[in-house]
Amino acid sequence: SEYYTTENQIKAAVDGTYDGLDDLLSSDLEIATVHLFNLEYLVGTSYRPRAAGNEQNQFLLLSGLEESNGIIRNFWKATFFPLENCNSVIQNVSATDIISESQKAKYLGEAYFLRAYYYFQGVQLFGDIPLKTEPTVDLNTVKIPRSPKEDIYNQIVEDLKKAEQSGLDWSDKTGHVSMLSLIHI
C-alpha cells in the first residue's frame, strides 16, 4: 500500500480501526446487543425499546424485520467497514519496517483485538456472517458467502490470543486497547 509509508500514516491507520466503535456505541446497535432488550424481541414480548421515532428505528419483532430496514443495514456496515480497516492494518503493519518491533506489536495487538470485537458483535447480531481476514484488493471478491458461527468464534479466539501475545500495556489512558481490554471481553 502507498499509504503506510510514514509513522504518522501508520498511527492514523491504527486509529482508524477504532472508528467502528462510534457506530457500535453511539447508535441503536448497542440496544440490539444488550441482552435485556434483544431477548424480549426473540421471544416476541416487546416491540420497541423507545416510544418515539419512525418505524425503522423502533425495532419491530425480529421476525418482521427485513434486510431493507436502514437500521439493520447500518448494523451490518458497523460490523464490516471497521473489519476492513483492521484487515488493512494487520496486513500492512505486519509488512512494515518503518516502526520499531515493539510499536508494531502494539499496533497489531490493537488491530487483532478490535477485529475480534467487531466479529463478536457481528456474530451476536447476525449469526453466520462472512469471515474475511484480508483487505479487499479486488471489488469482484467483495461478495463472499457466510461462514458458520463456529468458524467466526474460532477466528475471534485466535485474534484475541494474538492480541494477548502482542505486549500491550496493562492499561492505556488514551482509551486504546490494552491488556485490561482483553480481560473485559
Regions found by a protein language model. Give the residues of each.
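Conserved small/polar residues in nucleotide/adenosyl-binding loops
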Residues: 183-185
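Amphipathic alpha-helical segments of tetratricopeptide repeats
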Residues: 164-165
